[in-house]
Amino acid sequence: RLVWAMNKAENDAYLEKALSGIPEHFSGKLLEVPVGTGILTMPLYKTLPKSDITCLDYSADMMGQAQEKADRLHLKNVTFQQGDVGALPFTDGAFDVVLSLNGFHAFPDKEAAYREVFRVLRPGGIFCGCFYVKGEQKRTDWFVRHVYEGMGFFTPPYETAFSLKKRLEKRYATVTLGTVKGMAWFVCRKGLR
């Protein structure tokens, strides 16, 4: 709350919007990158038993925590793979949905990450998620610059809501984007060609 200046309702609102790109009763292939500790998504994946979910993270420690959560929930449809979002080890068009919660502000090579996510998404597929954008909340911007960057949690440069919308519109056929304080959420659909 101190950093993001959000109450629980605001936090829940941006997460709900970010996850709204995953269709109800989804039964396709989903890539989550980065999975982090899985705290936000493992309970959701319990409701998607017919889907094929791959969770990728650069950090073996974070991924291990997510895998423990999946094991506790007896998730049989979720697999884990260590890797780099800038060089995804998947074929072109391998996924129906790519989900990225709170990741892009940390990725060191954001251009490669955007390119790779687009590459592994099938035509007509959905890219959805959320991450920090600068210029929406002064207090958050200060913490990011003076605390999180030094701890290695965030890596500049950062998008603004405007630059993110423009970037996504260059790649995707449809883009829905909003902000809640310093967080942007988005749902994009890749064109059919």
Predicted regions and their residues:
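A short glycine-rich, Lys/Arg-flanked "PGG" loop and its adjoining helix->strand segment in the class I
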Residues: 111-123
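A short SAM/SAH-binding and catalytic strip from SAM-dependent methyltransferases
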Residues: 97-109
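Conserved class I S-adenosyl-L-methionine
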Residues: 1-26, 39, 43, 142-148
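Short glycine-centered segments of the SAM/dcSAM-binding site in methyltransferase folds
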Residues: 29, 124-126
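C-terminal lobe and adjacent flexible extensions of AdoMet/dcAdoMet transferase-like proteins
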Residues: 187-193
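C-terminal alpha-helical "lid/dimerization" subdomain adjacent to the S-adenosyl-L-methionine
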Residues: 2-8, 128-180, 184-186
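Class I SAM-dependent methyltransferase SAM/SAH-binding core
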Residues: 29-87
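A short acidic, Gly/Pro-enriched loop at the edge of an enzyme's catalytic core
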Residues: 86-97
